[in-house]
Amino acid sequence: MGDPGSEIIESVPPAGPEASESTTDENEDDIQFVSEGPSRPVLEYIDLVCGDDENPSAYYSDILFPKMPKRQGDFLHFLNVKKVKTDTENNEVSKNHCRLSKAKEPHFEYIEQPIIEEKPSLSSKKEIDNLVLPDCWNEKQAFMFTEQYKWLEIKEGKLGCKDCSAVRHLGSKAEKHVHVSKEWIAYLVTPNGSNKTTRQASLRKKIREHDVSKAHGKIQDLLKESTNDSICNLVHKQNNKNIDATVKVFNTVYSLVKHNRPLSDIEGARELQEKNGEVNCLNTRYSATRIAEHIAKEMKMKIFKNIIEENAKICIIIDEASTVSKKTTLVIYLQCTIQSAPAPVMLFVALKELVSTIAECIVNTLLTTLNDCGFTNEYLKANLIAFCSDGANTILGRKSGVATKLLENFPEIIIWNCLNHRLQLSLDDSISEIKQINHLKIFIDKIYSIYHQPNKNQTKLLGTVAKELETEIIKIGRVMGPRWAACSLQAATAVWHAYPILYMHFSHSYSGLAKRLANINFLQDLALMIDILEEFSVLSTALQSRSTNIKKAQKLIKRTIRALENLKIGTGKYESQIEDLIKSDKFKDIPFNKNNKFNALPRSILLDNIIQHMNLRLLSDRNHEDIFNYFDLLEPSTWPYEEITSPWIAGEKTLFHLCKILKYEVDLNDFREFVNNNIKSNNVSIPTTIYKAKKIVSTIAINSAEAERGFNLMNIICTRVRNSLTIDHVSDLMTINLLGKELADWDATPFVKSWSNCNHRLATDTRVRQKSTKVFHENQLAIWNLK
């Protein structure tokens, strides 16, 4: 058999598609080799485990020349895999050629010229011993395969690629029809076949195909470049060019959203940029919609995560309204106090569609939305201190309203009715008790119906009106209804400014209205209502300010009540102008008279009613009277200094209840120091815990004006032209518009990187949906070919 130690035995593996057709006898003691071709080194080595055999000659024959199909035997001369016996084995074979009493385990080593001996790692063997292997492999086979293919790993009897699992996607190296195998990433590769040989061949084929696959090769290239950097950073470095192109697309989408433009405008914007030399592929409205969704999601995730990590106290503001498409929606806002901001921060949370307007549905929608944003029930129990909304029965009903159901889950929260709505209700309650006020309301509503007819009639009516007065007449809306004071003031002031022109119009077509305008009592009532509404408008505007808190609101309300008391004694700004206006040239054509059919308003009774209802609705709130007393503890100007002793026992008892309401512990030593310093001097520094408690008090929202602003933005976004937008899409657009920075200050790069990490395609990827191009007819192009 040749010189000892020099016998060369060549074998061929049953690899490739023919592997499943192998007819080799099923035997545990088989040896299999895989070759990738003459251009690659030795790829596989599987050791042989021997046992007793009565026919040693046949045994060695099977070792030296394994049984195989003829088609596989024809390729023997292509292989460069070699197996060398040791000296001991050759001597034993030469002495006992015909029989062996006991076959020893042969020792083989793979050699490639020059011959290099590799000793297996002991630690790797121990790891193999602890693994659950595929049912067609033994430990030595598994060890040698994992040694040869460094990327191969075994988990729970299944194969996977640790390199592909680490990188997962190709990033900038992505190509069309080239994808990383999900099975190799997730360790889900298993053998196929009904017998051991077929299953072994199946695994060899799968390993071979994955090893030579284009996607795996690109993964290997990425890993070679990641020697001194993490995989994630490497992908981003490889994607720099693509990211820069995608950033420009994100900036375009962001600008469209901030300017409330339809996302379909991106096609025109990108067409212009392509004309200027910028070429990318994310230029359809579908891509723009996905990008807007991603930006909104990332914004919320980052902002709300920071709030939760800071353990900030929060107040929830909600309101309900209908969209253009008549869908009932719930807008949710959140006001919180954070360390980096001196004043509370108001944040838009979401716009949600309501399946039903019953209280239970609203509560479920609210809590589900908050949970989706990361605010769990445990967090809300520890940090939710207040809930604010308008005075609708569904929301603030005492028996089964939203507020009542929230109190069942969070019993310590403060329920606050919007002060602006309460202000309007106090005015409505006052005028509803005086019948004469209805004449003014009916008249202005009649003017509204006349001048808000279809465009043709409106143009005819306003044809003779001066341009400066045309705008004022269009402003005339309804008054004394479910609208805030500023709206009623705008309508009444518009009538005041257009008074002579209205009389001229009505004298020709509406004689009844003209007679009413000629009644001096009507002019006096109009002036009085403008003076009253002006005070209400000033207060309403001040209450809507984001910087107004509970204490400041109380001061503003008391100031307005004093102004109305002064108006009761004297005359208002507009009332004092009546005599001069009647004598002026503008009013000279109006024959003023006193018509007893329309009596003047009982001025004193009206003002008394307004003052009384303002005190009842805005100041004498039994539900919040104790809370106001607790909050006064943080305002030294309200303290009864003549009763204060050191330490202030009564104040410390109140402090205990205040801490329970605010869900924040004020240090007792800080409070005592705060009291002592204020007794000695007025201008003192505020201790840390006292300062934070005052900030938490300011977190309580006093109105739902922000929710009204949100609905105003919703109406701007969801017009009749864009009514196909879903509620979720409108919510995303509102999120970017309300929470996003200005375009000049906004950095799109982090959003693009997170977009890439979510396996979305970048702007340079040609696999994305392409925008449709407008095809010009030959006749349209023909005119440009004229010479």
UniProtKB/Swiss-Prot annotation:
UniProt-annotated stretches for the region Interaction with SUMO2 2: 42-50
Location of region: Interaction with SUMO2 1: 30-37
EC numbers: 2.3.2.-
Top-level EC class: transferase
Region (Sufficient for E3 SUMO-protein ligase activity): 1-223
Residues in cross-link Glycyl lysine isopeptide (Lys-Gly) (interchain with G-Cter in SUMO2): K85, K119, K125
Keyword Transferase in annotation: yes
UniProt GO BP: protein sumoylation
Protein keywords: Isopeptide bond, Transferase, Ubl conjugation, Ubl conjugation pathway
Molecular function via GO: SUMO ligase activity
Chain ranges for the short sequence motif PSRP as given in the UniProt record: 38-41
Region entry Disordered, spans: 1-36
Keyword Transferase recorded: yes
Pathway(s) per entry: Protein modification; protein sumoylation
Domain comment as written in the entry: Binds UBE2I/UBC9 and two SUMO2 molecules via its N-terminus. The most N-terminal region interacts with the SUMO2 chain that is covalently bound to the UBE2I/UBC9 active site, while the second region interacts with another SUMO2 that is non-covalently associated with the same UBE2I/UBC9 chain.
Complex and partners: Interacts with UBE2I/UBC9 and SUMO2.
Function of the molecule: E3 SUMO-protein ligase; facilitates UBE2I/UBC9-mediated SUMO2 modification of target proteins.
UniProt-recorded name of the protein: E3 SUMO-protein ligase KIAA1586
Source organism of the structure: Homo sapiens
Species classification: Eukaryota, Metazoa, Chordata, Craniata, Vertebrata
